[in-house]
From Swiss-Prot:
It comes from the Eukaryota. Residues 6-35 form a coiled coil. This is IQ motif-containing protein H. Residues 401-430 form the IQ domain.
Length: 1059
């Protein structure tokens, strides 16, 4: 048995050959009878000898199969190649024909078979040639003793017994014929094994992935020999689906294809249908290819039935020929259709595909899959596929003209159908677009109507509540009330987006909290920024100093007034942090904050004060069901512009600079400037202001000294008197001359006061004509003073002056940095008259609430009389008013604008008046680097603070906790010079403390310090003149002496512009 295990392949081949020879000998003996000397020979002895031989062979075969089936094979090392051994020559057994007697055919006639026997024999032969007939296996078992297995449709060949044979890496060997089902194994074991069961034809079984095991003792030479025998698994038609599922990068072994052409393939990837085949993995261990034993060729799509290779193949697979005929017909038809000249068929692969059911044409997976199956049985399938893929190859074969005609008709029908479909689809699409547009338009119209109805309802409620507020105003101001401060800047969207730090800019009015100095007032302040605990604690302690200030004792207990204010922050701050929405809009979309405000004001008299009124202010007031102390947003947008202010000043009858407004075209700009220059020859500079801009951003100027015709025009003006000049024809000729030079004058000599928003004159001019603007004369004087007055237009009809102060201007002279309170530049009676007329004009236009009026005063160079011009009007709560409220709380005083005095209740000292210098926004790039706690410790160390006993010192206004880019500062002293000196000293100390030698930073500190130092330098020179004027003028001495001081101060501020 050991020898059998050693040479199992040889023993199997010998047993098969002996079995075939015995079967052939028995068949020949049965077919004829022999006769010797005229007598019939007895061949029973020979038949018995053959039977005994068959029984012996059967026993040996059974022992062989039992031994092989019980053997467990182990795979050899991957890197250790199989040793090549010389295959022994197969021994072919032949019966000893010499020992047989010479048999001669019997000469006596043999009777032929009956018709029934002939019919039965023909029927049996038909059944034998049809392996799919149910009785095929039964007839084989009855007539030949062969138990055939059940033929089943399988996608892969499954081997259920232990495979025997030589170990080839991770591959096993099995015959093409499938194994009988398990229920027939016992019956088959009792019979003699057939030739198919013992055949040594090597075909692949189902491949299984085996992990590569590295061996340290394997040499490089052996590995090189193994890798030379590389195979391309892409040519295995039976493993198409499996190879598509396996990764090409995994280190796994693949089953080898049973094709002789695989070893010499060019490893090209098939396109289209074959593109799904996985590429060969160079890391896997290759195995030698198995050469086909039964190949045959198909020439020009036809099989030669007389060819030797085809006859040999047909003889080998005669039992399954009925199933192979259909596959061969399909293959021939395909080769004929594509005019393939030569195709080599691998017989074993074709038989395997037929038996496994892979060539089942009724699986419905498409023509591409059928072509794959057919090509998988060809040894030269790459060449055939390349030929089939050539353009027009199908039309060269059988039925090419008809196929071309079908293709043309198909393409044309497809084109026609596609065109008709696209036309219909386009119509359907157009209908859908129209329907969607109509639906969208209908919804938008409905939404617009809803919004209009909602805004109309809010506007009606605003007017009705305003009337109720006007009726009960005196009662409300004398009783306990709650004021809701919403410091919203309701600018237009382009202006809001162009402002840097818009949220902090809205929070520069924290001084509104100081309204709680009235015992009947509670304040709810809505902050547009997130305030930290440091800022909240600062204002809590600051507002709690009222008792200490009133008693003049810093150690006094904290006042209960700090409990009468609430600071709220809308929850929508984080949701709209980058959209620059005004505070009213943020509050509108903050339902929790609105609900909390409702709870705080429930059962109390309350009203709301906004900044620059916006439409959402009305929505918030309507949601809270409280009146709004402000102006209708439409009216605010109309009169808060530069042109709107000019119209109010004109109707009020106050003096204002010569100019023109509502300019929207370039021709009107040129003509208006030429007319103004010709009419007012004394004006040396003209200003251009954009209607919607604030803070001096949208201002430009041009000097008339650059006109070439200016000397000639001046001579013409001198020849006429001022009264005659306005009516003479010379003015018209001068205007025409000026009109010719104006375009060049503006393009060459126009300058911008602030380049932070508009860099060039062209950019400024574009926005000027787009948004509208005004032309305004600059005061014709070297000494001028600007001041601002805050008015309250009460719902009851009264006009109150809440604050008045002289402005501190920046280097450009057109930008406000701070102010001094109270004002000392204009006679209080004149100021009160101007403010009253402007306030009444505003009330006639339904303007209510807080407004801010900008004035300029100077001495007329012709008659040296003081002139007061109204230059600007802002509708809303101003920063100066907020700082004034902080000043009044810290001094416990009252500001009497009728006399321009800040009256403080007397204390231990005899001083009963104070002066204050305030700045709303002190900017420094190093301020964000210092926390507020460190900042106040620094101020305390440097002696910067507020004396509650003397009611003078320094107070800061904090704006936010996050960025800390700016802060406000207020200095209070017994006189104006002391307040200015304290303010300048504080700026100098703060600048030195927060700035390093190598990092000074950008700020507006230096400009303010320089301006204040120049003003203080003139104080000593004016003291003597002030004393003399007090003796002469009596009552008016207080404001006249300081008027000269401020005239010099403002002249110093405007010198950079006049140069």
């Amino acid at each position: 048995m050991a020898s059998v295990l050693k040479n199992k392949d040889e023993v199997g081949n010998i047993l098969v050959k002996v079995q075939d020879d015995l079967r052939q000998l028995k068949k020949n003996i049965v077919q004829f009878t022999v006769q010797e000397n005229g007598e019939i020979l007895d061949i029973q002895a020979l038949d018995a000898a053959i039977i005994r031989t068959e029984n012996g062979i059967r026993r040996h075969a059974e022992d062989y199969l039992k031994t092989i089936n019980n053997q467990v094979l182990t795979l050899p090392s991957i890197e250790e190649p199989e040793k090549k051994t010389a295959h022994p020559k197969l021994v072919t057994w032949q019966p000893p024909y010499e020992a047989l007697p010479i048999a001669h055919p019997h000469r006596s006639p043999i009777p032929g078979p009956s018709p029934g026997e002939k019919h039965k024999t023909a029927f049996i032969m038909r059944l034998l040639h049809n392996p799919f007939h149910p009785r095929n296996k039964e007839i084989f078992q009855q007539n030949y003793g062969i138990q055939l297995p059940h033929l089943q449709k399988r996608t892969s060949i499954g081997i259920q017994r232990v495979v025997t044979g030589s170990n080839l890496g991770n591959f096993a060997i099995a015959h093409l014929q499938p194994k009988p089902p398990p229920e027939c194994q016992d019956a088959v074991a009792e019979l003699q094994p057939s030739a198919a069961d013992l055949s040594s034809v090597q075909t692949p079984v189902q491949p299984k992935a085996v992990h590569v095991l590295q061996r340290e003792d394997s040499g490089q030479n052996e590995s090189k020999k193994v890798y030379k025998q590389e195979m391309d698994v892409r040519r295995d038609g039976m493993a198409l689906r499996r190879s598509a599922m396996e990764s090409a990068e995994s280190r796994l072994l693949r089953a080898p294809p049973p094709s002789a052409a695989s070893a010499s393939s060019d490893n090209r990837v098939l396109t289209r249908g074959l593109a799904r085949l996985s590429p060969i993995n160079p890391q896997s261990l290759p195995v030698p290819a198995v050469v086909s034993k039964y190949p045959f060729t198909i020439v020009d799509g036809q099989i030669d039935p007389d060819a030797a290779d085809f006859c040999r193949y047909k003889k080998q697979y005669c039992l399954y020929w009925g199933a192979m005929v259909e596959a061969l017909e399909r293959l021939q038809r395909m080769l004929l259709d594509f005019a393939v000249p030569l195709a080599r068929v691998c017989g074993e692969r074709l038989a395997a595909c037929v038996q496994s059911g892979e060539l089942n044409w009724r699986d419905g997976r498409g023509r591409c899959t059928h072509v794959e199956k057919l090509l998988s049985v060809l040894e030269n399938r790459d060449e055939v596929w390349d030929l089939m893929c050539q353009p027009g190859q199908r039309y060269k074969g059988n039925g090419g003209h008809q196929a071309a005609a079908v293709r043309i008709q198909t393409c044309w029908r497809r084109y026609s159908a596609r065109t008709a479909y696209l036309i219909r689809l386009r119509s359907k699409w157009a209908a859908e677009i129209i329907a969607m547009s109509l639906l969208k338009r209908a919804k938008l119209c409905h939404l617009k109507k809803s919004l209009q109805a909602s805004r109309l309802r809010q506007l009606e409620n605003f007017h009705s509540r305003a009337e109720s507020l006007a009726t009960n105003w005196k009662h409300i101001t004398s009783a306990k009330r709650t004021i809701i401060h919403v410091p919203s800047l309701g600018y237009s969207q382009p202006r809001r987006l162009s402002l840097r730090g818009y949220d902090v800019l809205q929070n520069t009015q924290m001084g509104r909290l100081c309204d709680i100095r009235d015992e009947n007032v509670e304040v709810i302040y809505v902050s547009p920024v997130r305030l930290g605990e440091d800022v909240l604690q600062y204002y809590t302690r600051l507002l709690g100093l009222q008792t200490a200030i009133e008693l003049g004792d810093a150690s006094a207990t904290e006042s209960h007034s700090a409990k009468r204010f609430t600071i709220l922050m809308p929850e929508a701050l984080e949701d709209f942090s980058t959209r620059n929405l005004c505070l009213a809009s943020l509050l509108k979309y903050s339902p929790r904050t609105l609900k909390r405000i409702k709870n705080l004001i429930k059962g109390k008299q309350a009203y709301m004060i906004s900044g620059v009124t916006h439409t959402d202010d009305l929505a918030v007031a309507d949601e809270l069901q409280i009146p709004l102390l402000g102006t209708d947003p439409v009216v605010t947008q109309l009169y808060s512009t530069k042109s709107g202010g000019k119209r109010i000043f004109s109707s009020a009858g106050v003096d204002m600079p010569p100019g023109k407004w509502d300019i929207y075209t370039l021709e009107k700009l040129y003509e208006g400037l030429a007319q103004l220059m010709a009419k007012h020859m004394e004006v040396q500079r003209w200003l251009f202001k954009i209607d919607s801009e604030v803070g001096g951003r949208g201002t430009a100027y041009v000097d008339v000294c650059h006109l070439k015709s200016r000397p000639w025009a001046q001579q013409e003006f001198i020849r006429h008197e001022p009264q005659q000049w306005r009516t003479s024809q010379s003015q018209d000729s001068v205007m025409i001359k000026f009109l010719e030079e104006v375009p060049h004058l503006l393009a060459s000599y126009a300058r911008l006061a602030n380049t932070s928003c508009y860099k060039t004159w062209a950019c400024f001019l574009e926005h000027f004509l787009k948004e509208g603007g005004v032309i305004e004369a600059f005061p014709p004087s070297q000494s001028l003073t600007c001041l601002a007055v805050d008015l309250l237009l009460e719902p009851g009809g009264d006009v109150l002056m809440l604050s008045c102060g002289d402005q501190l201007r920046g280097p450009s002279g057109l930008e406000v940095l701070g102010c001094t309170v109270p004002q000392t530049s204009i006679c209080p009676e004149v100021l009160h008259s101007v403010c009253t007329r402007v306030g009444q004009a505003c009330q006639q236009r339904s303007i209510m609430g807080h407004i801010s009026l900008d004035l300029v005063t100077f001495l007329d160079p012709n008659n040296l009389e003081q002139q007061v011009w109204a230059i600007d009007l802002d509708l809303g709560y101003s920063n100066q008013l907020a700082m004034t409220q902080l000043m009044l709380m810290m001094t416990r005083g009252t500001l009497n604008c009728r006399t321009s005095k800040l009256e403080v209740p007397p204390s231990e000292t005899s001083v009963t008046s104070r002066f204050a210098v305030m700045c709303t926004r002190l900017l420094h790039t190093n301020l964000p680097l210092v926390y507020y706690s460190t900042f106040f410790l620094m101020c305390k160390a440097q002696g910067i603070g507020y004396d509650v006993k003397a009611r003078q010192g320094t107070v800061f206004a904090l704006h936010d906790s996050r960025y800390r880019r700016s802060l406000g500062m207020l200095t209070i002293s017994e006189n104006l010079q002391g307040a200015l000196l304290t303010f300048a000293r504080n700026l100098s100390i703060i600048h030195q403390e927060i700035s390093a030698p190598n990092m000074q930073g950008a700020s507006n500190f230096k400009e303010l310090i320089k301006d204040i130092e120049e003003v203080l330098g003139m104080t000593i020179q004016n003291q003597t003149a002030s004393q003399e004027e007090k003796e002469i003028t009596g009552v008016g001495s207080d404001w006249l002496s300081t008027h000269k001081l401020h005239q010099h101060k403002m002249s110093q501020c405007t010198k950079p512009i006049l140069q």
